[in-house]
Amino acid sequence: MTAAAELRPRRVRPVRIWLTLVAMLIAVMVLVGGATRLTESGLSIVEWKPVTGTLPPLNDAQWRDAFEGYKTIPQYRELNAGMTLGEFKTIFWWEWGHRLLGRVIGIAYLLPLLWFLWRGAIAPEWKRALWAIFALGALQGAVGWWMVASGLSQRTEVSQVRLAIHLTLALVIYAAIVWTLRRLAGRPPIVAAARLKFTAIALLALTLVQLFLGALVAGLRAGRMFNTWPLIDGALIPEASRLWFEQPWWKNLFDNHLTVQFDHRMMAYALWALAAWHAIDALRARAGGAAGGALWLFAALSLQAVLGILTLLYQVPIGLALAHQAVGIVVLTLAVLQVERLTASKSKEAPRVMPAPASQRG
């Protein structure tokens, strides 16, 4: 065994712990963002100050200034006129906490990355990927403000499309970190039929589409309408005149409450059916760890479907809505792991974390 091979487990472990903690922080960030949306707190801070905005108001004068800023936007004038300073503080803390967590994640990612690079602990083939993840994180901060800005001038809420982009980008970053963690583990590949790989990839792609659709539902508050199941608007499939009345037709996919909720339901049915097929196929093929992964993915999707139905029937209580969002993250995690285990190549060496140069070893 070479010295590099002997050192690999010891050198990989700190990197994997770091990425695991970052992934956990992102998952928490997504849930805090969900709570911020559900409590209608996302527009309480009307400025974007990436550095100086780290500190909250520290005295009465600063609190009054922040409140006066909120009073200038349509949401206050049309929905919250008469709100007290105490009520404003409640929504302010949600948004401030969400933004602070974003800053914490940036620091928790960048500083250890620089440390590992300085120590020579990351192999060249991973440097570009890790920097790309950081770049996506920086972009996510800008997208977050782009989303908030959509609700500051003419709307009483943020754009549902920008909200969906913001959430989906966060989950893409999360998925990239989960993928990297799995590859760094260096587990042996699973021999499986091409159809299993195809359905696993399809499940991951459709999961991301479904999460985007769910964000559209949330942004439009469409979950507070058509609160029946399995019927929607009195039918299994609503009338075309109700689904496609806006012009041009494609606007219905983003702006029509009925169409957006119907699309989210139909995608859920498709995902559940595909996951069931994938699990049965993996079991019949005796695909080893992939069979277990397929069963876990199907179980998580089944739980997610139940939570989605309950969230709809009870008209989006915060607890159920956040549970639905949390299980969505679990589904995405399992989908990423399933694709990774089925697409790992035998011909390639397992991803390496390089030992530090002798001069830098402690």
Curated annotation (Swiss-Prot):
It catalyses: Fe(II)-heme o + 2 A + H2O = Fe(II)-heme a + 2 AH2. Keywords: Cell membrane, Heme biosynthesis, Iron, Membrane, Metal-binding, Oxidoreductase, Transmembrane, Transmembrane helix. Pfam families: COX15-CtaA. It is found in: Cell membrane. It is a multi-pass membrane protein. Its cofactor is heme b. Its main location: membrane. Its EC number is 1.17.99.9. It is an enzyme of class 1 (oxidoreductase). GO terms for cellular component: plasma membrane. InterPro entries: COX15/CtaA_fam, HemeA_Synthase_type2. The chain crosses the membrane at residues 15-35, 104-124, 129-149, 161-181, 200-220, 266-285, 293-313, 316-336. GO terms for molecular function: metal ion binding; oxidoreductase activity, acting on NAD(P)H, heme protein as acceptor. GO terms for biological process: heme A biosynthetic process. The keyword Iron applies. Pathway: Porphyrin-containing compound metabolism; heme A biosynthesis; heme A from heme O: step 1/1. Heme binds at H264, H324. The keyword Transmembrane applies. Interacts with CtaB. HAMAP family: HemeA_synth_type2. Catalyzes the conversion of heme O to heme A by two successive hydroxylations of the methyl group at C8. The first hydroxylation forms heme I, the second hydroxylation results in an unstable dihydroxymethyl group, which spontaneously dehydrates, resulting in the formyl group of heme A. Belongs to the COX15/CtaA family. Type 2 subfamily. This is Heme A synthase. The lineage of its organism: Bacteria, Pseudomonadati, Pseudomonadota, Alphaproteobacteria, Hyphomicrobiales.
